[in-house]
A protein has these predicted regions:
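Glycine-rich phosphate/diphosphate-binding loop of Rossmann-like nucleotide-binding domains
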Residues: 29-44, 147-219, 224-226
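Rossmann-fold NAD(P) dinucleotide-binding segment
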Residues: 6-9, 13-16, 93-98, 217-218, ...
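ADP-ribose/adenylate-binding Rossmann-like module
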Residues: 50, 88-90, 101-113, 237-280, ...
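Glycine/serine-rich phosphate-binding loop and adjoining beta1-alpha1 elements at the start
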Residues: 1-17, 48-56, 61-164
Length: 373
């Protein structure tokens, strides 16, 4: 993770987080460990709990040592909250929701679903929307989720995607990435959306766009990428083909209604493969649920490649420094400063050995004429 490594070296030299206590609710993986070590190098005391205990890498948690809580999800949140952090780095917004009114100096949120939730609250501290940074959306969501979700599905099932009909529910940046990668693997892709702008974009990209109930009868593989709940439910399950595969690449295990699936199957379910539960509905059709409905790229694969998380966690680290050092920021969800976004992108380009052009003074002056004051 060369970008985060360069940031860690700078933080170690400058100590901008000295005396700052950080609470983090993130997936406990080797990549996250590099973020924690960078923050510690900058002087911070970091308390970490697992955003999803099912995907925790316990050897990583052990290696990180003190202030790491990887048991029950709620117990972990409570332990980090009890540390009374100054800053919070969150994946899902539950830690922010619990602490934003208790004197937090600031927070960051990694997920779209978390930001949707926070925008319904009267948040009492500044929250930097890391998920909406340009470098995050372009790299993490589009390329990271696009690749790792399919890694999880293929790894769990050993299926050939070519020739399959893949239904992608949700066409944000992550859904776009999943749809593009599935098409690249030879699948026919149907997109289902509730947002007319995104649905139009999907159609103009060449994907078939259908209501989810129509798509339910045609799909071989269903991938939810919405950040919402009950996206696939009983009315969809009753229309699906025998052998349909159900995977969640969104957030938490609520996008596929497990209650509806279990109600339809009763006791007719079995472990077909280590990460595949097969549910047989009354007419004999078998529906295959991957990784208990958990996030498939983490629960059935290794998550995003380190090269992707390098960008995400570089944004997190520099955002934490910004929150710790900036003068009083207004409360509420707000953009990551463009200067941080640009710096991370430039560092990533350097790590790839890529050089780009620089505007001439004349070009800068010309563009400046049209820039808002």
């Amino acid at each position: 993770m060369p970008v985060l490594r360069s940031i860690r070296a700078r933080l170690s030299a400058e100590q901008p987080l000295a005396g700052v206590r950080i609470g983090a609710c993130l997936h406990v993986t080797a990549e996250t460990a590099n973020l924690v070590l960078a923050l510690r190098a900058g002087g911070a005391e970091v308390h970490l709990c697992a955003a999803n205990p099912y995907v925790t890498q316990h050897d990583v948690a052990e290696a990180l040592g003190e202030h790491v809580h990887v048991g029950d999800y709620r117990d972990g949140l409570a332990a980090v909250a009890a540390a009374e952090p100054d800053l919070v780095l969150d994946d899902g917004a539950e830690l922010i929701a619990a602490l934003h009114g208790s004197g937090l100096r600031g927070a960051t949120e990694e997920t779209r679903s978390g930001l949707v939730h926070l925008r319904t609250l009267d948040v009492q501290c500044p929250v930097l929307a890391v998920n909406e940074a340009a470098s995050e959306r372009g790299i993490n969501d589009r390329f990271g989720t696009g690749q790792s979700a399919l890694d999880g599905i293929v790894g769990a099932t050993h299926m050939l995607l070519a020739g399959q009909t893949v239904v992608v529910l949700g066409y944000g940046w992550s859904g776009l990435g999943v749809a593009l990668r599935a098409r690249g693997a030879g699948a026919s892709v149907i997109v289902c959306e509730v947002d007319p702008i995104r649905a139009l974009e999907a159609r103009m990209e060449g994907f078939e766009v259908l209501p989810s109930l129509e798509a339910a009868a045609r799909g071989d593989v269903f991938i939810t990428v919405t950040g919402s709940r009950d996206v696939l439910r009983a009315e969809h399950f009753t229309r699906m083909k025998d052998g349909a595969v159900l995977a969640n690449a969104g957030h938490f295990d609520v996008e596929i209604s497990l209650a509806d699936l279990r109600a339809l199957a009763g006791d007719r379910h079995a472990q077909a493969l280590p990460l595949v539960e097969q549910y047989e509905v009354e007419d004999g059709r078998r529906l295959n649920l991957l990784a208990r409905g958990q996030v498939v790229n983490l629960a059935a694969a290794q998550g995003h490649p380190a090269a992707v998380m390098d960008v995400s966690f570089a944004l997190q680290a520099l955002s934490a420094v910004h929150l710790a050092s900036a003068d009083a920021l207004a409360p509420g969800v707000q953009a990551v400063p463009a200067s941080i976004d640009d710096e991370v992108a430039r560092l990533k380009l350097v790590s790839l050995g890529v050089e780009i052009d620089v505007e001439t003074p004349g070009q800068q002056a010309y563009r400046g004429r049209w820039s808002p004051a």
